[in-house]
């Protein structure tokens, strides 16, 4: 069974109106201070993990109590995940760290169907969550021997540079005939795609973070954890296959010209990286200040191409979420997604991921246009490298019902008496059961077609069950 840890956070919340504090994200005004405290012990007989599979935190935001439900992002790393760095004499050093018991979670706020969360629990709680349409950031405060955390909105982070930041991709690439109607595009979990990526960190990043490889790794892991949530809405799993750090020097000429650097990176990937690490896509993360307002660039409709399934991203913000959105943006170009135009929407008042101008208030959602363009490209071009499902890293042992593990040969990992869909002796689905859980699953049966499973955001339309899946398919139409 997925081990459940119920944690209540006792929060003394103190809004600091007009005051400021220096946090990892920068100088922050108007924040709340909270003190997490674990009150509930582990269930009797449960095995203690360093980081539990499931956690719940209760706290107040603006005086209102909320419950944050978190689940470990078990698909974050590939089974053969590797890390590479270089010695002073130029030797390549490859390691395969144990990543099963990592500390990166995704989740939601209870009783808020539109909420999301992306949290690192490595050293306190750090990340962001969306509550009632508003995005909040949370991170530990830099106070010795204290459990204090700050909760705040991005708008309260003082901006050092107000200049517009843009993707360097232009709209003049060769286009293909789009599908005529959104209703022609029907995507389900059976068509899920799997994108294994490698992040390459250049030497300017090493200098920026003072050679602290642990800090660089945490920064990258947090970014990937964020974008996995964004890509779930496109039915694409993002898996980190490798992280390469150019610890001593750059292996290509990293220029301020985004075009030249992208070309060099693609050529290097084709002749070097692709032969060492199994992956579908590579992204270069640099602290080099690219020319003009450009903070990212990628080839369009290039997935699986050895030289062109690449992008570059400038580490342009101290707010991890903003760099993560830029990364998600460039990767989407590789999947055939163009920049959003005026008619594209991801909810009333929201700026979507594929806006050509990287908006500080951007949500981590793709627009209806992006959804259609991505799957139009996948269906027409059928890039083969994203078809294979990576191996899972779950524990494998003799299947025993109710033993807290999801093992080979079992459909379920909890005491089956708690779920009418399962046979307690075999941990297999009962005859006639269609599903176990999901927004369109009710007592082991798919909900009827037309049942609302996700309420609209703003002017968007509701999402409806299709009668053939437990998942809630995204409505391709928009208001």
UniProtKB/Swiss-Prot annotation:
This is Zinc metalloproteinase/disintegrin. Residues 1-20 form the signal peptide. Disulfide bonds join 304-385, 344-369, 346-352, 435-441, 440-465, 453-472. It is an enzyme of class 3 (hydrolase). Pfam families: Disintegrin, Pep_M12B_propep, Reprolysin. Ca(2+) binds at residues 196, 280, 385, 388. Expressed by the venom gland. One of its GO terms (cellular component) is plasma membrane. Residues 21-187, 390-414 form a propeptide.
